[in-house]
């Protein structure tokens, strides 16, 4: 027998042994799966006999949401069709009206940035136009319009080295807000990891400048995580604000998929906890996006963690994809499901819960409640 023929025979025999081993492995795998399925069926049958759990009674997201992803192995279509078109309840007010135009021109003339514009908030027409109550609301975005982080859900511009901070911004902001005649204002900001203090000093100065100019105004601040540094969190928390907000964004399991690698679940919890330590009178607040792949058990655990951290206010909103470059929507959650989550959170002891497809962390849904809550707290502190 030629050497080449012998070599081929040996290869055939070796392949046969490999196939035999693989088949045995598959048989074992199938056997294990069968056992697991049998155990699962038995457990489900037992749970059915015992009745539904609290979580099942409270909410089943599968009953209230539909998937928005393309089929496995295919790209999501950019054209609207029956499978990827937004549901009818996701309708925003048009961006028009006298109040809207007045606020837009004022913001532009002063060279200010708003998260309403930069993050493409769907509520800009309602908030800037005044909505049903006729009160115009804007959220001022401090420290520029470019962030040093790149979260997969966010439409704000990113750069490793954004433009330097405008040292006159605190005064500009205070003058603008005084001219608008507001009694409740929300500040937020981009992340500025390019500064040694991560922008905490600039943020705190803006708050204290406004407080000195308008002592009675109520100030809510939606802050970055300041990389979890206590001294920086304390600096902002004690600068004169009334509401300290920092967004968890999503459940622990999905943090890396949704947020920049420098953000994380435990760090954000610590930020909210530390703000209370630095200023116990503060109302603390956070926001969660739904429709990014979260599960019921994930949300329940997140709510428990937030309550254990002393968080007072939570909001739920639907994630909407800013562009095809961003993270796709996993599911559109119905208004009924949002209402159920509001009930669950209220039963867990949160002071206020805003929950709905169009709700955002800076949305004005809670302003009237927050104003009354804060005024009552201030009265108690004085007393």
From Swiss-Prot:
Lineage: superkingdom: Eukaryota
Cofactor note: Binds 2 [4Fe-4S] clusters per subunit. One cluster is coordinated with 3 cysteines and an exchangeable S-adenosyl-L-methionine.
EC annotation from Swiss-Prot or TrEMBL: 2.8.1.8
Domain Radical SAM core: 132-351
Transit peptide: 1-19
CDD domains the record matches: Radical_SAM
Residue ranges of the region described as Disordered: 69-97
Cofactor(s) demanded: [4Fe-4S] cluster
Pathway named in the protein's UniProt entry: Protein modification; protein lipoylation via endogenous pathway; protein N(6)-(lipoyl)lysine from octanoyl-[acyl-carrier-protein]: step 2/2
Subcellular location: Mitochondrion
Gene3D superfamilies xrefs: Aldolase class I (3.20.20.70)
Catalytic activity: [[Fe-S] cluster scaffold protein carrying a second [4Fe-4S](2+) cluster] + N(6)-octanoyl-L-lysyl-[protein] + 2 oxidized [2Fe-2S]-[ferredoxin] + 2 S-adenosyl-L-methionine + 4 H(+) = [[Fe-S] cluster scaffold protein] + N(6)-[(R)-dihydrolipoyl]-L-lysyl-[protein] + 4 Fe(3+) + 2 hydrogen sulfide + 2 5'-deoxyadenosine + 2 L-methionine + 2 reduced [2Fe-2S]-[ferredoxin]
Main location: mitochondrion
Positions annotated to bind [4Fe-4S] cluster 2: 147, 151, 154
Gene Ontology terms, MF aspect: 4 iron, 4 sulfur cluster binding; lipoate synthase activity; metal ion binding
Keywords on record: 4Fe-4S, Iron, Iron-sulfur, Metal-binding, Mitochondrion, S-adenosyl-L-methionine, Transferase, Transit peptide
One GO location term (cellular component): mitochondrion
List of residues binding [4Fe-4S] cluster 1: 116, 121, 127, 362
Family per similarity comment: Belongs to the radical SAM superfamily. Lipoyl synthase family.
The protein's name in its UniProt record: Lipoyl synthase, mitochondrial
Organism of derivation: Phytophthora infestans (strain T30-4)
Lineage of the species this protein comes from: Eukaryota, Sar, Stramenopiles, Oomycota, Peronosporales
